[in-house]
């Protein structure tokens, strides 16, 4: 059994959350789901509500829970929780991605440019402005 819990940050009703909950249960890993919205939490009694409109408020709630329960990792389920998860991990002194990595993981253009520049095979692409009338 793990000595701490994993903090899973998920948007309300993410279809991905169930897979994380199932995996943690199967591996006997304690999991706390931090989610926003009105839907029931995936783990009754093991979840916390966070404010999606304010990172500061969400982080305050996470800090309060962390003062009573040790977290060993923080994971996001979706693009919409990647940046908050990075901030939470840093706040809790857990391993975290650099802000540049967070940006690249949630921006396809930046990710493809980084891959191309590093010599990683990537599909051809070009930036297109939606309001571009030159073509």
Which residue stretches match the model-derived regions?
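ATP-binding N-terminal substructure of ATP-dependent carboxylate-amine bond-forming enzymes
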Residues: 1-101, 105-110, 117
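Active-site nucleotide/adenylate-binding loops and adjacent lid/helix of ATP-dependent enzymes
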Residues: 107-135
């Amino acid at each position: 059994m793990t000595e701490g819990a994993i903090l899973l940050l998920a948007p309300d009703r993410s279809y991905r959350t169930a897979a994380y909950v199932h995996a943690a249960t199967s591996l006997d890993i304690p999991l706390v789901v931090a989610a926003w919205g009105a839907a029931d939490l995936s783990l009754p009694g093991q979840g916390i509500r966070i404010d999606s409109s304010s990172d500061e408020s969400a982080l305050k709630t996470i800090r309060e829970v962390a003062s009573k329960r040790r977290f060993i990792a923080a994971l996001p389920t979706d693009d919409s929780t990647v940046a908050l998860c990075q901030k939470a991990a840093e706040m809790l002194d857990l391993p975290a991605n650099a802000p540049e990595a967070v940006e690249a993981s949630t921006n396809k253009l930046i990710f493809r440019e980084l891959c191309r520049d590093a010599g990683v095979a990537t599909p051809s692409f070009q930036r297109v402005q939606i309001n571009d009338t030159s073509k």
